[in-house]
A protein has these predicted regions:
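Short, low-complexity N-terminal intrinsically disordered segments enriched in polar/charged residues
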Residues: 1-54, 58-66
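A beta-strand edge to alpha-helix "cap/lid" segment located at domain peripheries
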Residues: 2-29, 98-169
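Charge-dense, low-complexity intrinsically disordered segments
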Residues: 31, 35, 80-83, 136
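Intrinsically disordered, low-complexity regions enriched in Ser/Pro/Gly/Gln/His and often acidic
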Residues: 7-8, 43, 85, 89, ...
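Generic ordered-secondary-structure signal
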Residues: 35, 41-44, 72, 96, ...
């Protein structure tokens, strides 16, 4: 996106067309350590979704860098709030989640590590967001998430997330 406030229009492949995704053919890990790291990277992505859905802010702060950066948009609608620290994301979620009367679930699929070094990783995933109440289960939105991770003191953490939602919810 050309600026923080620009929003690409909805169309098939809008994330790729507007340079928000960069999925490439999978690469073989360079050795056993990178292969094990790749498994952990997948789990960190899943833990991020769990931490949001279950309001596990202690987990969230353990898997995000302090200077974590969150950006995103709803295609053709609006940018999402730009959040620039892990503590600010926790504060934002603590204010927003109680306004909902449902249980959100982020289901990730098609997770692919597109770039990996010994200390950094670029990861893409699809997310299906659902809402559950005692009466119904409702699909809310689909999205792509792009994660940039760094390995700090031997621990993989998310440094940045871009969430590209296909529709408002």
């Amino acid at each position: 996106m050309s600026s923080e406030t620009s929003v690409p229009p909805f169309s098939g492949g809008w994330g790729h067309t507007h340079g928000l995704t960069d999925v490439r053919p999978p690469r073989m890990p360079l050795g056993l350590e990178q292969a094990v790291d790749r498994l952990v990277i997948h789990e960190v992505v899943a833990a991020y979704c769990w931490s949001v859905d279950e309001a596990q802010y202690d987990l969230m702060t353990q898997i995000l860098t302090e200077d974590f950066d969150f950006q995103g948009c709803i295609a053709g609608v609006a940018p999402l709030d730009h959040i620039t620290r892990a503590a600010d994301l926790v504060t934002w979620l603590q204010a927003w989640l109680p306004t909902r009367c449902d249980q959100l679930r982020h289901s990730t699929s098609n997770v692919i590590v597109t770039e990996q070094t010994d200390t950094t990783a670029d990861v893409h995933a699809y997310v299906t967001l659902t809402s559950a109440t005692p009466e119904a289960l409702t699909p809310l939105a689909t999205a792509f998430y792009r994660f940039w991770l760094v390995k700090q003191d031997g621990t993989w953490r998310i440094a940045k997330v871009f969430s590209g939602f296909d529709r408002a919810f």
